[in-house]
Amino acid sequence: MSLTSFSIQDILARTGGNRGKDTRTDGNNISPPPSPSADEGHNEWPRAENPPLTPEKEKTDTDSGTEDFHWERDTETANNGAFTDPSSGDRLADSPKSSKKRSRAAFSHAQVYELERRFSLQRYLSGPERADLAASLKLTETQVKIWFQNRRYKTKRKLIATQTAPKSSLVPTRKVAVRVLVKDDQRQYCPEDMLSPSLLSLYHAYQYYPYMYCLPAWVPHLPL
């Protein structure tokens, strides 16, 4: 069985007599192919508004229609903002937090020294004074304002800490009795006794008396 050509030339070359032989179908049924003609060497489908579909082409069209439907549904969902990538959920959740983080300004030693010196003289600055100080230090007015606020808070916290410190030192100390085991016959030595012990203690500590030797008197010998 040869395949029927669906080219435009073949459709236009068909005569009007073949139109009467077309059989229309109701619903989704496709009309059966007509009997082959004698003057044509191959089978042709009669001309119709919608040419019949082969099983392969019908399957391809059905798949393409399904893909188009999915693509339209995904596009509509993405436009409504409901479609989100699960892998990018954490990044989307963290993006507002990262945008809210502010970079901390780093001051040089000269700037900190000048700010400290000005703070020791004046803790509160007016608008013009703040602008002049910021211009001289090459800073913004916001940076100078925030630095003075933090410095005042730090000073206040130190003051509160110093005020609460004496109260803790006034707490009465408790005396705790400690038992010391000392024998009754044991003598307690003072530091002075340890440095210069008395002779009496050494005398009593000596166990034996010294021996006394009696020597005869020396008598000179006179020559006779």
UniProtKB/Swiss-Prot annotation:
Compositionally biased spans, kind Polar residues: 77-87
Entry keyword Nucleus: yes
Ranges of the DNA-binding region feature: 100-159
Record keyword Nucleus present: yes
Tissue specificity of this protein: At early tailbud stage, expressed in the pharyngeal endoderm, concentrated within the pharyngeal clefts. Also expressed in the mesenchymal head cells in the future infrarostral cartilage. Beginning at the mid-tailbud stage, expressed in the muscular layer of the midgut.
GO molecular function: DNA binding; DNA-binding transcription factor activity, RNA polymerase II-specific; RNA polymerase II cis-regulatory region sequence-specific DNA binding
Family annotation (SMART domains): HOX (SM00389)
Cellular localisation: Nucleus
CDD domains in UniProt: homeodomain (cd00086)
Cellular component annotations (GO), alphabetically ordered: nucleus
Composition bias type Basic and acidic residues, residue spans: 55-76
An annotated GO BP: cell differentiation
Segments for region (Disordered): 1-107
Alphabetized UniProt keyword annotations: Developmental protein, DNA-binding, Homeobox, Nucleus
InterPro entries named in the record: HD, HD_metazoa, Homeobox_CS, Homeobox_NK-like, Homeodomain-like_sf
Similarity remark: Belongs to the NK-3 homeobox family.
Extra remark beyond the main annotation: Based on similarity to Drosophila 'bagpipe/bap', the name 'zampogna' was chosen after an Italian musical instrument related to the Scottish bagpipe.
Protein name, entry field: Homeobox protein zampogna
